[in-house]
């Protein structure tokens, strides 16, 4: 007899992941990402293309925010930020790789790549806030 949990759980998980992705869109993701995901209408390959394009955009934003933040802080803080950023990249990659479950099918792939997009977006915003706070202090 088939385990209904194996069928229902991935569907619920995907719905949750896409709801979370949509809420993240309202914060710092590009308007193009919102439009792309709406147009994807739940088609996995289209969603993956949207996520990939947004991840590239957010990765460029992250690199820019990182450079700008480094330029705005003291030499001592720069060394600490470099260490923190290296460790953060390792954490992001390990965390998102954890979501890639070969038994999870396309759902696991969507979750893994969207994890990278979300974490990259959040880190870019965090670095911008840190830089702004440093200017005020």
Regions found by a protein language model. Give the residues of each.
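N-terminal alpha-helical modules
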Residues: 2, 22-137
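Bacterial N-terminal signal peptides
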Residues: 8-20
